[in-house]
C-alpha cells in the first residue's frame, strides 16, 4: 500500500504544471493602468499608425490606430481585450505586472479546457473577455521560442475553417516584434 501512495504522489508531482496556471486576457482597462503608471509609449504610438484588418484577407494602414483607438477612430472599450499591441508592448506590460506570456504550447494546453463560446467566422464582433473563450476573439501573442518571430495563438474573429484555421492548434502565424493589429492582443499567465 505504501508503494501505491508513493507512486501516486510521484504521479501527481510529475503532472502538468499548467493545471496551476490561469490564462487571462489583458483588457483595455488592464493595459490603461499600466500606461498610466509607467508612461510607456507603445510601438503603434511611436510610429503614428498601425494595421487595421477589415477581413481575413484585407487590411489598411491607418494613421492614429493604437490601443486607445484600435480602428484609428473609435475609443477602445475597457472590457475588451487590448489590441494594437506588439510583442514589445506585451513584454513591457508583463515586466510591469510581474507576470509572463505563455508559450505557444502552454496557451493551447490551458485553453483546451475552456468550453465557453469561441468567437470566429465573422459571426460576432470582438467580445468582452469574461464572456468568451480566449480562442477566436483576438490573436494572442506568445513567448518567443528561439526565434525573432512572434508566434500568434488562438485565431481571431476573422478566422474560420474556410480561411485561416486560426482556432486550430497546428496553425502557424508569425509576426515581428513591433507588429500590432486590430485583432492582435495578448494574454498572461497567472500562477
Language-model regions: role of each:
Residues 77, 126, 183:
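Short coil/loop residues immediately preceding or within conserved phosphate-binding loops
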Residues 19, 129, 134-139, 150, ...:
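Residue-level detector of short, conserved catalytic/binding motifs and their immediate flanks
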